Regions:
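Non-heme di-metal
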Residues: 1-220
Length: 220
């Protein structure tokens, strides 16, 4: 539930993958991908009990970034997105093999015709690590400005798309990682300019780093 623990576990999991250290996961049982019940991905990732959750569009007004309060609201909203992005990356790692098998067995020639390659898992583990870095950058800026992640209400809108696509790998890849991420790329430069106009160079540096990483998420 703790985003800071999520970041730490993400770093550990990526290190384990790079070093070839097994830390759980499924296995083939004839033509079925089996995952122990304790390792099934949750229907909804847990959140801290004191999190203030509101409907999409009902969170604190962000303004145009001219005031520190407005910039805090913008950074907080972005940190919420990055926290969900960590969850989404790991969710597609966990669900991918079973969904790939389902596609193969469907007989649809446009679907994947072989087990997912190691590069699939490596790419999404790297994505999870990037999102963890992004959350950390944003959380640090919030702390620098006298706030913290969790100080403002957040919404769970991104996870709604995950629920809608959890039974279709191609839909998940298209909606989450092409549509939503691409929308972020469109908005990011405008957000960066708001912080630049306010003279917030440290946030500009953090947001620019995030933007450049997100470009690779869409292009690969």
């Amino acid at each position: 539930a703790s985003p800071l623990h999520k970041v730490a576990y993400t770093r550990y999991a990526k290190h384990a993958l790079d070093q070839g250290i097994p830390i759980g996961g499924g296995a083939w049982r004839e033509s079925e991908w089996y995952v122990p019940p304790t390792e099934e991905p949750p229907d909804r990732p847990p959140r801290l009990q004191d999190e203030q959750c509101v409907a999409p569009g009902q969170q604190s007004k962000r303004g145009r970034g001219g005031s520190e309060r407005s910039r805090i609201a913008l950074l907080h909203a972005l940190a919420n997105i990055e926290q969900w992005a960590i969850d989404l990356a790991w969710d597609i790692v966990a669900r991918g093999p079973r969904l790939s098998v389902r596609h193969m067995q469907s007989g649809d020639t446009e679907r994947p015709d072989m087990p997912l390659p190691r590069a699939y898992f490596a790419d999404f583990c790297q994505m999870a690590l990037d999102e963890a870095k992004h959350f950390t950058l944003l959380q640090q800026r919030l702390v620098d400005m006298g706030s913290f992640f969790g100080a403002l209400p957040v919404h769970h809108g991104l996870w709604d798309s995950a629920v809608e696509t959890r039974e279709d790998l191609c839909a998940r890849l298209s909606i989450i990682h092409l549509v939503h991420e691409a929308r972020g790329l469109d908005v990011n430069p405008l957000t960066i300019e708001k912080f630049r106009a306010a003279g917030d160079a440290r946030s500009v540096d953090s947001l620019t780093t995030i933007h450049l990483d997100e470009i690779t998420h869409v292009s690969t």
